[in-house]
Amino acid sequence: MSVVTKSIVNADAEARYLSPGELDRIKNFVSTGERRLRIAQTLTENRERIVKQAGDQLFQKRPDVVSPGGNAYGEEMTATCLRDLDYYLRLVTYGIVAGDVTPIEEIGLVGVREMYNSLGTPIPAVAEGIRAMKNVACSLLSAEDAAEAGSYFDFVIGAMQ
């Protein structure tokens, strides 16, 4: 839930106007909107590069994943792994635009550990792939923008652990 929605819901639940503190938080949210959109646009425009490079790094670091018997062995399973990385990158962009982790949590992280466990997917490898995406993505951004984006990647990585 964005800071705007959260503030309005809280104020309405108490039948009051928005407080000066809530208005300040909304003002900050609005003033950082252009930056958040710029970050999301950069990640979106570079998504293929980010996912491919992260996948290459993951498979180099974890060759067991793409070896016979590995969860991403074979062309089809490797493509499935890259599709999952792309999915998490998309969720990260949603969080960045919203300025909040709620879309990430509600759309894509509920039950994710259970799903991967049931499929026999090594969760540490998924987290490693997301960490690699974070590194590739952040290399495309300024230090300030990378810090902003990095926190959303970290949230997803944390959910995997």
Swiss-Prot record:
Q: Which UniProt keywords apply?
A: Antenna complex, Bile pigment, Chromophore, Electron transport, Membrane, Methylation, Photosynthesis, Phycobilisome, Thylakoid, Transport
Query: Where on the chain is N4-methylasparagine found, per UniProt?
Result: 71
Which InterPro entries does this entry report, sorted A to Z? Globin-like_sf, Phycobilisome_asu/bsu, Phycobilisome_asu/bsu_sf
Q: Where is it mainly found? A: membrane
Specify the domain of life of the species encoding this protein. Bacteria
Gene Ontology CC: phycobilisome; plasma membrane-derived thylakoid membrane
Q: Where does (2R,3E)-phycocyanobilin bind?
A: 81
Q: Where in the cell is it found?
A: Cellular thylakoid membrane
After translation, the protein is modified as follows: Contains one covalently linked phycocyanobilin chromophore.
Q: Could you tell me the membrane topology recorded for this protein?
A: Peripheral membrane protein
The biological processes this protein is annotated with in GO are: photosynthesis
Q: How does it assemble?
A: Heterodimer of an alpha and a beta chain.
Family membership: Belongs to the phycobiliprotein family.
* Cited PANTHER family: ALLOPHYCOCYANIN ALPHA CHAIN (PTHR34011:SF2), PHYCOBILISOME 32.1 KDA LINKER POLYPEPTIDE, PHYCOCYANIN-ASSOCIATED, ROD 2-RELATED (PTHR34011)
Report the function annotation for this chain. Answer: Light-harvesting photosynthetic bile pigment-protein from the phycobiliprotein complex. Allophycocyanin has a maximum absorption at approximately 650 nanometers.
Its name, as the record gives it, is Allophycocyanin alpha chain
Task: List the source organism.
Answer: Thermosynechococcus vestitus (strain NIES-2133 / IAM M-273 / BP-1)
Quote the gene name from the UniProt entry: apcA
